Amino acid sequence: AMDTVRSAALGIWVGGGSREETPEESGAAHFIEHMLFKGTQRRTAQDIARETDAIGGQMNAFTTKECTCFYGRVLDDHLPQALDILFDMVYCSSFAQEAVETERGVILEEIDMYEDTPDDLCAEKLFGAVFAGSPLARPILGREETLAPMTGAFLKAYHDAHYRGDNTVVALTGSFSQEVLEDIRRRFSALPAGKAPAPVPAAYTPAFVATPKPIEQNHLTLAFPGLDYNSPKRFALQLLSAILGGGVSSRLFQQVREQQGLCYSIYSYGAGHAETGVFCIYTALNKETEAKALATIRRVIDDFLANGPTTEELERAREQSKANVIMGLESTQSRMSHAGRSLLFSGEILTPEQILDAYDRVTREDVVALAQEIFDWDRASLSAVGQVRTEEEYRQLVLG
């Protein structure tokens, strides 16, 4: 509860996401996310839209490789009705075949949009290569050939098998009454018991992949094995990422962009999954500056491995990360997201104080040891999109 607000954020989090799909089911989890807005046994799609607008609410959803989330934000007075709409959508969808045909076309357009978004495509091709042979390699949206045979009956069967009580978290933050809590408990207890099928484990394998696209800039993602999302080292990883590529004072931004003008955009990030992860450095630049930029990135990493961070860098990264936590948890929406994601993935919710304390406890030695664990050049990978070189040429540029 947040006593100083008049709104509430509500989310239904379903574990699994696209990584629970078989190759033939690729895209089903995301297809279902779309279909749950298209009508229930009690409401048409227009009813859902009109009722949501009538209470001044916002409803949306997203699918990742690990989960699907349906969420809404409303004034506290309208929370009971929002709760009814959301549970009706998520658990009583009609999966009408006519709506399936229409929505398939929408998703195919969404796939085309991603094909035309080179930074997203670059990451997707990277994951497809380093996790080849596992569900983590497949795109969340699926492909035209996997979506084509999906019917309403197929999607409903997939939904019923995966949307189980033991696989679901309901998160509520903001201003709400005890009656609303009781309503959630009652609805949640009525959900079918059981868990969804366990996902197939994935493991990182180094890979180089080049995807030709007729665009002006080349988009590069350099990657190394990372951490799973529950790793106790994840706070050290955040500080490492902040120092290397987390902002305008970071080493990569300063040395690749500010000092040499080799790119416009460059940053680093960690992508964690249940049992594995990837640490990525992304940049967008002209083909003529690729070689120099990649050499600079390697030099920055090797210098960090040899000398570690300065005291000033470490404290700046710590304060930056702690500020992001505090500012990020001041809205009902972000706090709901933190609670739902944490409970679904780790079974516990760390308080803001616990998170800040975890950052305070990270030492310089922790960050240096983690960098030495991650930055093994023999396990480096790269995805390139644009006016690309060959994969072997990129291998030579990265590995020397």
Question: Language-model features: where?
Answer:
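His/Glu-based metal-binding/catalytic segments typifying zinc-dependent metallopeptidases
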Residues: 2, 11-13, 195-251, 388
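Short polar/acidic secondary-structure junctions
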Residues: 2-4, 271
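Short strand-connecting beta-turns/loops that link adjacent beta-strands
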Residues: 4-6, 64, 164, 215-216
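M16/MPP (pitrilysin/insulinase) zinc-metallopeptidase core fold and M16-derived inactive scaffolds
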Residues: 6-73, 246-262
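Short alpha-helix boundary/capping segments
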Residues: 20-27, 228-240, 244, 248, ...
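Charge-rich, well-structured scaffold segments of protease-associated domains
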Residues: 45-199, 210, 227-228, 236, ...
